[in-house]
Amino acid sequence: MKNCVEELRKSMGLSQEKFARMMKVSRQTISAIETGKYNPSLELAFAISNCFGGPIEKIFLYHDDALVDRR
C-alpha cells in the first residue's frame, strides 16, 4: 500500500524514532510502513492519520487491480 507517511513525518520535523514512540511501535515498523514493506493495522493507520490531522484515505492509498472494473 502506498502512503505519504514519510513526507508528513518529515514536514512535522519528526524522526522515525520519535514518531515511533508517539505511535507506540518500533522505529523498524515506521520504516517498513514508509517503504511499503508493511501495511499497518487499521488501528495504527487511524492513529497515524489522527496524528497528521488528515483523512486516512489521503495518507494511505490503496489500489487493487482486482477491484478495477473490467468492462
Where are these regions (language model features)?
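Residues in the helix-turn-helix
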Residues: 18, 29, 58
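Short, basic-rich loop-to-helix N-cap that marks the start of a DNA-contacting helix
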Residues: 37-47, 66
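Short, charged recognition helix plus adjacent turn
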Residues: 50, 60-71
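Short basic helix-loop element that most often maps to the first helix and adjoining turn
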Residues: 3-22
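DNA major-groove recognition helix of helix-turn-helix/homeodomain DNA-binding modules
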Residues: 43-58
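Recognition helix of helix-turn-helix/homeodomain-like DNA-binding domains
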Residues: 25-38
